[in-house]
C-alpha cells in the first residue's frame, strides 16, 4: 500500500499516452527513488511549462513566445504552409528537418461520430491565411485515416477558391518497408501513388 501522494502521482501518470497503471507505477517508483535527480527537476520543468507555454496565435503550435519560434523565423519559406491535425503532427514534421515552410494546426479532425465539425477546427483561420498572396502552396499532412482523409478533402474544397496549390503527403510503402509486412490499404495506396523511375 502506498500513501495518497504517491497514489495520486501514479493516477496522474497513468493518464499519459502510452502509460497504463503498471507503467505509471514503475515510473512513479523511479521518480520517488531518484527524487533529487528526477522528481524535483521534473516537477520544476512541469511548473515552468504550465506557467509559460502558450498556443501560438498564428499556427497553433506550443511555445513560450507568441508567435512561436517557427512563425517568427524569417528564414522559413513563407510560400509554403503545411496543415497538420495537431501539434504532435507539427513536431513530427519538424523532426524530419525536411520541411522549411510554416504550419497551420487544425486542432483535430472532422468526425461525425465524435461530434467534431468544421466549426470546431481551425479551418476558418487557415482559409484566411490562404488568402495571403505570399502563400502559394498548402500541403495537407493529415493522417491516412478515414477522418484524416475526410478532413483533407473538406479543407481542399474550402481552399479551392483561394489562389494556392493544394497538395497532400504521399501514402504508401515506408522506407525500409517490406511488402509482406504491410496491410492491404497501404499497398493499395502505394500502388496508386507510384512514380516513374
Curated annotation (Swiss-Prot):
The keyword Zinc-finger applies. A zinc finger (C4-type) spans 56-71. Keywords: DNA damage, DNA recombination, DNA repair, Metal-binding, Zinc, Zinc-finger. SMART domains: TOPRIM (SM00493). Residues 79-174 form the Toprim domain. InterPro entries: DNA_Rcmb_RecR, Rcmb_RecR, Rcmb_RecR_Znf, TOPRIM_dom, TOPRIM_RecR. Coiled coil: none annotated. HAMAP family: RecR. This is Recombination protein RecR. The gene is recR.
Amino acid at each position: 500500500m502506498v500513501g495518497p501522494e504517491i497514489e495520486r502521482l501514479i493516477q496522474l501518470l497513468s493518464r499519459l499516452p502510452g502509460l497504463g497503471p503498471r507503467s505509471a507505477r514503475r515510473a512513479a517508483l523511479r521518480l520517488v527513488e531518484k527524487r533529487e535527480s528526477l522528481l524535483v527537476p521534473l516537477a520544476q520543468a512541469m511548473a515552468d511549462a504550465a506557467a509559460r507555454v502558450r498556443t501560438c496565435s498564428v499556427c497553433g503550435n506550443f511555445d513560450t513566445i507568441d508567435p512561436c519560434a517557427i512563425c517568427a523565423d524569417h528564414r522559413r519559406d513563407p510560400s509554403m504552409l503545411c496543415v497538420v491535425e495537431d501539434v504532435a503532427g507539427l513536431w513530427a514534421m519538424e523532426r524530419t528537418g525536411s520541411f522549411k515552410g510554416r504550419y497551420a494546426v487544425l486542432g483535430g479532425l472532422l468526425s461525425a461520430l465524435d461530434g467534431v465539425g468544421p466549426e470546431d477546427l481551425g479551418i476558418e483561420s487557415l482559409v484566411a491565411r490562404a488568402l495571403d498572396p505570399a502563400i502559394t502552396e498548402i500541403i495537407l499532412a493529415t493522417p491516412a485515416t478515414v477522418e484524416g482523409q475526410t478532413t483533407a478533402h473538406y479543407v481542399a474544397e474550402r481552399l479551392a477558391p483561394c489562389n494556392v496549390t493544394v497538395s497532400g503527403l504521399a501514402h504508401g510503402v515506408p522506407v525500409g518497408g517490406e511488402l509482406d509486412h504491410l496491410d492491404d490499404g497501404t499497398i493499395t495506396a502505394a500502388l496508386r501513388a507510384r512514380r516513374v523511375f
